[in-house]
Amino acid sequence: MYYSAGTYESFAHPEKPKDVDKKSAYIIGTGLAGLTAAFYLVRDGQMKGEHIHVFEKLDLAGGSCDGRKDITKGFFMRGGREMDNHFEVMWDTFRDVPSIETPGISVLDEYYWLNKHDPNYSLCRASVNRGEDAHTDKQFKLDKDSAMALSKLFMTPEKDLEDKKISDVLPDSFWNTNFWLYWQTMFAFQRWSSALEMKRYLCRYVHHIDGLPDFSALRFTKYNQYESMILPLVKYLESHGVHIEYGMDVRNVIIETEGDKKVARQIVYVKDGREQTIDLIEDDLVFITNGCCTDTSCYGDQTHAPDLSGVKNGAGESWDMWKAVAAQAEHGEYGNPDAFCSDVDATNWMSATVATSNEEIIRHIMSICKRDPRSGKVTTGGIVTVKDSTDNWYLSWTINRQPQFKSQDKNMVLVWLYSLNTNREGNYVKKAMRDCTGEEVCREWLYHIGMPTEKIHALAHDACNTTTCFMPYINAFFQPRKESDRPKVVPDGAVNFAFIGQFAETPRDTIFTTEYSMRTGMESVYTLLDIDRGVPEVWGSKYDVREILRACYYAIDKKPISQAPLSFKEREMLKVLLKKVKGTDIELLLKESGLIK
């Protein structure tokens, strides 16, 4: 497997891999990583669909990319997906997955046209005082110490950031900047999250720094992620004969070390309450989704708080399977699940879905986001963060294009919200969010959008239906780590198995994204089948001096470098440097970026 960039490789069709007709594939998990692996086995590996078996414990494909309606409790959306135009593997996949809504076009075409006609951007990024615009005004408000620390982090080698927290590398003044408000709530980072992962994010999205304050860098699907992404991919695979088997609870993959080779020899699973096994030979390929950020999700509804009695450090079937596999490694080459699943107090947050058709509530929504949620177009354009809830729940909420579900009533609006501090009292509801019913969560949200307090209880009870989801491991992949804590997609010496998903290690890319999961799926197939076509590299904006200069301009709030907070000595040095580059292409680059006039 090798990486490539440019259209030469991306437009080419690889030759059929040697002996692929003799091989079979077993994919554990139907999240984006597993479905993408199946896709590349079919399209580029040219493996017969009937040779591909995808195992799923639940009765629905999609893993964490879900969205569903419970006929008794209402709509559930655990989370949303923010997409980037340089998710290279994602778009390489969806350019060949047919739309299930519009005949004759691909999912990529559908998505591309939608976001061209209805581009995303926010008109109110944060609120204060119960629905007033916080006027962050696209400013980062970085002080000199914070800006210098971010620059240093950008350039620090990953090895030097292993097992370090963000708070270990950034100054206290950073937490009061708009940059941190945008960053924390958009990506769900915490102060104790991995400094290494924050560095990856800075490098990966340096080309989007101008779109960070108002989400203009983002693109969204038309419906929820299940209906817009998972379902078309499942239908594509089924049309090629791929067999997806539900109710398959995989407990272990037995791996034997034979000299320099590592060979998967058996899959252990439970089906219909009975433990069974599948014996494997070297031509049987196994793709293991190790770990899951939504494992042990706890659901609540309008009248019930989520039941957290089963939540404890390390508990969860995906972790149990990974631990069973990791225990077979001689030198830790299958990763260290305990690095990610051993502190649920650090890795949890909670989301809720509010369904309402109430006109008064919708008017209050419109007064904040300045758009009609029933227009079918972008509404909030990303989350609205309640800035004065920082010391409480730290609530953010959003309304994507409506309807979010094809089965949704045309007058209904679905609101998604989440809290980073699930163990603190709310500003209005004097309980921790994790202890609240859906109705109580809705009261807190209604309070923050400015509903009259005397109406809040009645509206939350009669005019809204709210479902909730507490996720103990949703931030598990943000835990401080070292490189060896996540197994390589294909470990050294592995003959017929790979690790895929958010807890497999692939260079440069960022977790908590659709692209990361899909990239591991593509890389695993290309490696095990030795497909002779390049995997598109992670977009290289961190190596593009134009993007870096442009990022500097926006980081200092669109000021020329002469207005940056420089000391006398630094200003004198700047004068000398600018004189040296006068009349060169460097001067032109500085002018194009806005750093000099």
Regions found by a protein language model. Name each.
Residues V206-T221, D283-L285, N290-T520, Y526-G540:
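C-terminal segments that line or cap access tunnels to active or ligand-binding sites in enzymes
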Residues C203-L285, T289-G291, T303-H304, S309-V311, ...:
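Helical element adjacent to the flavin cofactor pocket in flavoenzyme catalytic cores
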Residues H13, D19-A149:
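N-terminal glycine-rich phosphate/pyrophosphate-binding loop and immediately adjacent elements
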Residues I100-H207, R219-F220:
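Rossmann-like flavin
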Residues V89-D96, Y182, S228-S239, E440-H448, ...:
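Amphipathic alpha-helical segments that form well-ordered structural scaffolds
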Residues G104-Y112, Y246, R533-Y543:
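Short, glycine/acidic-rich hinge or "gate" loops at secondary-structure transitions
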Residues M1-A25, R43-H51, K69, A551, ...:
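Extreme N-terminal leader/targeting segments of oxidoreductases
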Residues M1-Y3, A37, L41, G45-N85, ...:
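Beta1-alpha1 glycine-rich phosphate/pyrophosphate-binding loop at the start
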